[in-house]
Amino acid sequence: MAVDRPQNLQDTFLNFVRKNKVPLTIFLVNGVKLQGVVTWFDNFCVLLRRDGHSQLVYKHAISTIMPGAPIQMFEPGDEAGHAG
């Protein structure tokens, strides 16, 4: 029996940038800057690809994720974008 629950913002964001192949800049907690496209993610890590090379990045090491272009994941006025 499946329970229909809304996806969290983190998963919604990562899935959106993965599906749309949005280039990202990821800053780690130690200040390192990584760039690439998300090809896969789970609860603990993100697989980032750039120039034919993949990097497995643990989420606990990520400080900030910046898309390379503006993105709109929700329609204006969409209730999915509001915490409830």
Swiss-Prot record:
Keywords: RNA-binding, Stress response
Transmembrane segments: none
SUPFAM superfamilies, sorted: Sm-like ribonucleoproteins (SSF50182)
Record-annotated Sm domain positions: 11-71
Domain of life according to the entry: Bacteria
Primary role: RNA chaperone that binds small regulatory RNA (sRNAs) and mRNAs to facilitate mRNA translational regulation in response to envelope stress, environmental stress and changes in metabolite concentrations. Also binds with high specificity to tRNAs.
MF-aspect GO terms: RNA binding
UniProt KW Glycoprotein keyword: no
Family membership: Belongs to the Hfq family.
Protein name: RNA-binding protein Hfq
One Pfam family recorded for the sequence: Hfq
Family matches, as NCBIfam families: Hfq (TIGR02383), PRK00395.1 (NF001602)
Protein species of origin: Beijerinckia indica subsp. indica (strain ATCC 9039 / DSM 1715 / NCIMB 8712)
GO annotations of cellular component type: cytosol
PANTHER family: RNA-BINDING PROTEIN HFQ
A GO biological-process term: regulation of DNA-templated transcription
InterPro entries in alphabetical order: Hfq, LSM_dom_sf, Sm
Subunit structure and binding partners: Homohexamer.
Matching CDD domains: Hfq (cd01716)
